[in-house]
Amino acid sequence: MLMPKRVKYRKNHLPHIKGKETRGLKLAFGDYGIQAVGRGYVDSRMIESCRVIMAKNIGKTGKYWIRIFPDVAWTKKPLEVRMGGGKGDPEKWIFPVKPGRIMFELTGVDEDTAKHIARLIGFRLPFEVRLISRV
């Protein structure tokens, strides 16, 4: 699972996910990209399940890139603990996604396979995604 090796601060405020994305809007590596239409937080387990889908469906000739990295700590207090006593411990690592962000890129596959992969990835993310192409 993806997580940072070292962080300056263990606990941080959650970033706002209002508005549209201003970075990561264009394809940088592959011929096809999976772009977020909605907004939400993606954790490292979701990214790993998407990676497994791409690895299984691309084959030996294709290649994929993961353009997001979870570097924000998501904290949670234990169950049945009263309020107060400070912020909870980090539970998982997340990446805030705004509409327009390209999260994954693919190359070496035909358009039907890319559409199939985008559909499968859409089932595993908490917001809507779409396939974009360089052509």
Swiss-Prot record:
Keywords: Ribonucleoprotein, Ribosomal protein, RNA-binding, rRNA-binding, tRNA-binding. The keyword ATP-binding does not apply. One of its GO terms (molecular function) is structural constituent of ribosome. The keyword tRNA-binding applies. GO terms for biological process: translation. HAMAP family: Ribosomal_uL16. PANTHER family: 50S/60S RIBOSOMAL PROTEIN L16 (PTHR12220), LARGE RIBOSOMAL SUBUNIT PROTEIN UL16M (PTHR12220:SF13). NCBIfam families: rplP_bact. Binds 23S rRNA and is also seen to make contacts with the A and possibly P site tRNAs. This is Large ribosomal subunit protein uL16.
